[in-house]
Amino acid sequence: MKLGQGITTVVGPNGCGKTNIVDAIRWVLGEQKYRVLRSGKMEDVIFNGAEGTKPLGVCEVSMTVHNNAGKLPIEYNDIEIARRIYRSGDSEYYLNKTQCRLKDIMDLFMDTGMGVDAYSVIELKMIEQILSEMADDRRKMFEE
């Protein structure tokens, strides 16, 4: 899936996977709160199988970010971020196919507006929360 510059919206009927896309982006960027990902535990992101299809032992998401403008503090034009989790609970993170720490990914996106805690990926429930907040709280959020 390719997302262009500017604002991208994902629309579709209920149950078609819109929230799964948002969850995958949050997860690869380092989301640690499994409840944010609509799960009872982190391993729930791994495919549990279906009729005629066996469960998998691993989940992997990768995302490529273009750094042509040099806004990220790394000397690459294209940066691939990947995350894997195994049924054992072990997790791995990668930057450009080199294993790294979660902290390395968090540091890369710090102060860019693109990290896991940023408002660059917004779900409908977050919009509803923003609209119901007091004016001062909304102003602080936009200043972030």
Per-region residue spans from a language model:
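Gly/Lys-enriched N-terminal cap/neck module of very large, oligomeric protein machines
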Residues: 1-144
